[in-house]
């Protein structure tokens, strides 16, 4: 059977865990396009970036929602989920991997910490066209428009494809569809976190710490994903698995370092 004559195989993952609302919206949306396989962390794994589990076994379990089979959980990270899904759970290679829909944006430097984005990048490493979707809120989330846009973009990407080792990181404002200003193709903005470790004491008086901080934007303009999404634009940012700063290589050559 030719690829265009069958329904595409779509793998759905996230980093918020299989009970997160976003993955249920995303899976339902993708089922209108193809055959969906859901493989997600058993527990939330936000901020895990491209971590994978070594030295301890991974456990795979079936997960039921409303008394119906929904997908599989993996006792590991989002990247573990992609690896296990491709090597063990899925019988055929997927045509598309979609990760999300994440609680909270994954823009600027937050991209580097994101398990949602890392799952999509792992898909690209494995040679599968991959997308990452994030909603710009941690509370009072309305995934309605995000699910609708995810399906629209996924359909287009299935038709057009993406360059090798490239994903799209998609950030969607948490506003009604009528308030969406449009779609912007952006770069990864510049930012940093104002880090703060909040100290508390346990029942024995021993200190422990919660990491906290605020994302500070270091550039402005509609070319920045964070700047644009704050102005209610959906942003599409092409990301590559190649982290090389190619423009700096010629400068390094001029250093003429010797062994």
Swiss-Prot record:
Co-factor: note: Binds 1 divalent metal cation per subunit.
SUPFAM superfamilies: SurE-like
Class of this enzyme: hydrolase
A GO term, aspect molecular function: exopolyphosphatase activity
Names of required cofactors: a divalent metal cation
GO CC terms, sorted: cytoplasm
Keywords from the UniProt entry: Cytoplasm, Hydrolase, Metal-binding, Nucleotide-binding
EC number(s) from the headed UniProt entry: 3.1.3.5
Reactions catalysed, as given in the entry: a ribonucleoside 5'-phosphate + H2O = a ribonucleoside + phosphate
Positions annotated to bind a divalent metal cation: 15-16, 46, 102
Localization per Swiss-Prot or TrEMBL: Cytoplasm
Primary residence: cytoplasm
Domain of life assignment: Bacteria
Cysteine disulfide partners in this protein: none
Record's function text: Nucleotidase that shows phosphatase activity on nucleoside 5'-monophosphates.
Family statement: Belongs to the SurE nucleotidase family.
The protein, known as: 5'-nucleotidase SurE
Naturally occurring in which organism (per UniProt): Chlorobium luteolum (strain DSM 273 / BCRC 81028 / 2530) (Pelodictyon luteolum)
